[in-house]
């Protein structure tokens, strides 16, 4: 498998800062409930012992250390792209620390505070070497696997439309479902952030 192209720049950020009310709740219960991704190596994934690790997890631990004086006072809630904002809005989690692109509509319409950007990335396409494709402009007619309801899905639609190419989207709520579908040959292309493609490639057969 190889990654062949990037689409613009996306940002991976921490969405939702600890407000005064949230901070009070966190201190009263004695731990931070932190929303993370569902297993993205390097960002948020459990090791063989079940301990979460990665950049996003480190942010959770840093917030716990700053608010509670103990980096270990964190409980992790794995969330899909579809679930992440609802979980934060409903109070199921105190903060969200996972790969999430900050956009103007999200910044203004969700009622959430976006913290500073901690990772810049670009979207890419991954295809099997056997297809002999070297450019994203050769993907006309391809079936494309991705996460449903994400900027990744919208960016792909914009890219194919602006280049006058047909394609079929094959979208799933959970990233593991995307990986399984791509591995099983249900689509020709896997698209997400380039860092995500590099991480998920390790799970392919």
Name each model feature, range by range.
Residues 3-8, 18-75:
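N-terminal hydrophobic or amphipathic helices and topogenic motifs
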Residues 32-33, 69-72, 89-98, 142-143, ...:
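Alpha-to-beta junction loops
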Residues 33-42, 52-67, 101-102, 121-179, ...:
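Bilobed "Venus flytrap"/periplasmic-binding protein-like clamshell domains
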Residues 13-14:
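Gram-negative bacterial Sec-dependent N-terminal signal peptides
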Residues 27-28, 89, 137-140, 180-183, ...:
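Alpha-helix boundary recognition
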Residues 61, 65, 73-138:
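Acidic, polar ligand-binding/catalytic clefts
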Residues 83, 99-109, 155-162, 181-205:
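A ligand-binding cleft/hinge motif common to bilobed small-molecule-binding domains
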